[in-house]
Amino acid sequence: MDQNEIETLQYYLKEYGQQAEVFAGQLELMENGRMEALAAIEALEALATSEDGTVLLQIGGGASLRAKVLEPEKVLLNIGSEVIVEKTSVDAIEYLKDRITELEASQKKVSEALEKLRAQTNEIAKRLEQGYRQAPGGSPVPHRHDHEDHDEE
């Protein structure tokens, strides 16, 4: 394996690593969205069983207020692109359940893509290791001429 092939493999290894980070970030965002939807469903269901419509409203910093929901049957939902629609509590719960199903399907696809990417990354790493062993001197570091500025002030 020549130096150019080693450098090409190193480039692909770096690129695949960056893609894996993007996929992992997407998975995290999807999981956060799924958890928020589950929490919203739980809150709507609890509100439906509340006798007087009083809820704890978190206002940040660990502080909460007791608040009375004036219209517990009317839920405002952000459906994307800053579009807000009003739905009944039951319809909102159904919408959120559908959103969870979509998120889970997307998570599965991204997880599968991430697994394929990791398999390719492992294969490239193996090929690089072979290349390093075959390279003169067995050095895993490509020969670069880095200029250090130790003498400049």
Curated annotation (Swiss-Prot):
Transmembrane segments: none annotated. The keyword Cytoplasm applies. Coiled coil: none annotated. Residues 143-153 have a biased composition (Basic and acidic residues). Keywords: Chaperone, Cytoplasm. Pfam families: Prefoldin. The keyword NAD does not apply. InterPro entries: PFD_alpha_archaea, Prefoldin, Prefoldin_subunit_alpha. One of its GO terms (molecular function) is unfolded protein binding. GO terms for cellular component: cytoplasm; prefoldin complex. Signal peptide: none annotated. It is found in: Cytoplasm. GO terms for biological process: protein folding. Residues 126-153 are annotated as: Disordered. Belongs to the prefoldin alpha subunit family. NCBIfam families: prefoldin subunit alpha (TIGR00293). Heterohexamer of two alpha and four beta subunits. Molecular chaperone capable of stabilizing a range of proteins. Seems to fulfill an ATP-independent, HSP70-like function in archaeal de novo protein folding. This is Prefoldin subunit alpha. It comes from Methanoregula boonei (strain DSM 21154 / JCM 14090 / 6A8).
